[in-house]
Amino acid sequence: MQIRRAQPEDRCRMAEIFVYSNRLNYFPIFGDEAYSFSKLQVTAVLADFSEWIGDLENAYVWDDGILRGFVVSAGGEVFKLYVDAFFQGRGLGGALLEFAIAQTGARRLWVLEKNRCAQAFYARHGFLPTGEWRYEEGTSERLLLLSWEEPGDGQ
C-alpha cells in the first residue's frame, strides 16, 4: 500500500483534487456557479486549509510518486475522501477507505442523498444508511449518515 500521513507540502495537490472533485460531483447537484467557479478556488482552499479540508494530522494520502487521493478521518468518522478523477476506478478510494477503517477507527460518514455514485461506492465497502439525515448547511439538500460494521457483527 502506498498510503502515508499527509505532509505540509501535500496541501497544494490535496487542494487541487478537492476543488476539481467538488466541481465534478457537486456542481450537478447544487448548480451554484458562483460557488463552484468563483469561491471554490485552489488559492482559497490553501488560504484556509483546515476549514476546507481539515487538519493534516488526520489526513492520509495515496502517494506512489504522484499524490492521487486523500482521506481525512478522526473520531470514528470519515470527513473527506477524494481521489483525482483521472485515477478513479483503480481501487485507490477503496484502499484509502479501508485504511481509515483499520487505522483510524472510522465507522461512519455523511454523504449527499443525490450523490448516488458515492452511496454505491460506500455500500460496496460496507457503509449503509442508518436512517439518520440532516440538511447540508445553507441548502435544501439532504446528507445521509452511513455506518460501517465489522463483517459478521450483528449476525
Label every PLM stretch briefly:
Residues 2-16, 25:
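A short beta-loop-alpha structural element at the N-terminal edge
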Residues 74-86, 111:
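Conserved acetyl-CoA binding element of GNAT-fold acetyltransferases
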Residues 22-49:
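Conserved GNAT-fold acetyl-CoA-binding loop/helix
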